[in-house]
Design a protein with these regions (language model features):
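Positively charged, low-complexity intrinsically disordered regions
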Residues: 5, 73, 81, 99-101, ...
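Leucine-rich solenoid repeat scaffolds
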Residues: 75, 79-91, 101, 105-111
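Structural detector for internal amphipathic alpha-helices that build alpha-solenoid repeat scaffolds
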Residues: 2-3, 7-12, 31-49, 57-60, ...
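Amphipathic alpha-helical scaffolding segments comprising HEAT/armadillo-like alpha-solenoid repeats
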Residues: 12-27, 49-60, 81-91
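Short coil turns that connect the paired helices of HEAT/ARM alpha-solenoid repeats
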Residues: 27-35, 59-65, 90-100, 112, ...
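Eukaryotic acidic, Ser/Thr-rich intrinsically disordered low-complexity regions
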Residues: 109-134
């Protein structure tokens, strides 16, 4: 599953070199106490849903740890979108419920789930993200 066009265009949702670089480093320097978290996972999460088109390949990678890192980046990006602030919690009264409902609606992505289920969820997330651009 490739998210890359033949060449970058202004309509290409994956032409941000900073986000591309973060995804390329998604597996580097995992937290020794939390192997599912890396600096790139956290930085991607801070950027919100605009990172979703960049995560498609990592969410469907052969390596399960890469998929898990991509899942955590996706979760954090969505949590931020729905009002979660580290150290403060959910800042919108319905933020957590909306996050969880959307997660389920878009296939309940699971890094160690079956490939067909992952692919269906990835497709749903890519479709959803295409409706979120400002």
């Amino acid at each position: 599953m490739s998210n890359h066009a033949a060449g970058p265009t202004t309509n290409d949702p994956t032409n941000d070199p900073t986000i591309k670089a973060l995804v390329a480093r998604i597996d580097q320097d995992a937290d020794p106490n939390h192997a599912d978290i890396t600096p790139a996972v956290e930085q991607l999460g801070e950027l919100g849903p605009k990172v979703i088109p960049y995560l498609g390949d990592a969410l469907n990678a052969k390596d399960e740890l890469t998929r898990l890192h991509a899942q955590r980046a996706l979760e954090r990006a969505l949590e931020r979108h729905f009002g979660f602030v580290p150290g403060q919690g959910w800042t919108k009264p319905d933020g957590e419920a909306r996050f969880r409902a959307l997660w389920i609606k878009n296939g309940n992505y699971d890094a160690d789930g079956a490939e067909p289920a992952r692919e269906a969820s990835i497709k749903a997330w890519l479709t959803w993200s295409s409706t979120q651009r400002s």
